[in-house]
Amino acid sequence: MTLRNMALRKTALATALALSCGFSMLAYAHSGATGIVKERMDFFTQNKDDLKAIKTHFRNGDLDAIVPLATQIRDWAEKMPAYFPAGSDGRPSEASPQIWLDFSGFERAANANYQTANQLVIAAKAGDSKAAINAFKATAATCKSCHKSYKLD
C-alpha cells in the first residue's frame, strides 16, 4: 500500500468518524425533546441541511434548485419567533434565556434572516449568481449572529 493510499484511507476514516459523531450528537441533542421544542429543533436541522444543499447547488451552478430551499429558510424565519413561547426553555432546548429577556431583539434577528433569505429567493429566481451568492452569505451571517446571541453553546 502506498503512502498516498494510506493517507486517503486515514482521511476517509477520519471523515466517517467525524460524520458519525456529528449525527450521534445531533440525535442525542434532540433526544427527549417533545412538542414545540422538538418542532423547532427539527426546523433548525432542516434549515442547516438547506444551507448545505444550497452550497452544493452554487458549486453546480444550479440556481433553480436553490429557490425552494431558500424559500424554506425564508418561511421558517418568518414563523420562527412563534416557536419560542415563554416557558419553552430548559433542556433539551438549546435556546438561550436571552431570547425571552430580549424577545424584540430575537424577532429582529429572525426578521433579518427572513429578509436575506428573501433576497436569495429573488436573486436565484432572476438567475443572478452574484446577487444570490451575496444574499446566501448574508443569510448565513444572520444565522451565525443569531446563534451567537440566542443559542446555548
Q: Predicted segment positions?
A:
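Extracytoplasmic c-type cytochrome modules immediately beyond a signal peptide or single-pass transmembrane anchor
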Residues: 30-138
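The canonical Cys-X-X-Cys-His
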Residues: 139-151
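Sec/Tat signal peptide C-region and signal peptidase I cleavage site
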Residues: 23-31
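Bacterial N-terminal signal peptides
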Residues: 12-24
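Bacterial N-terminal signal peptides that target proteins for export
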Residues: 2-15
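Processing junctions and N-termini across compartments
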Residues: 23, 137-140
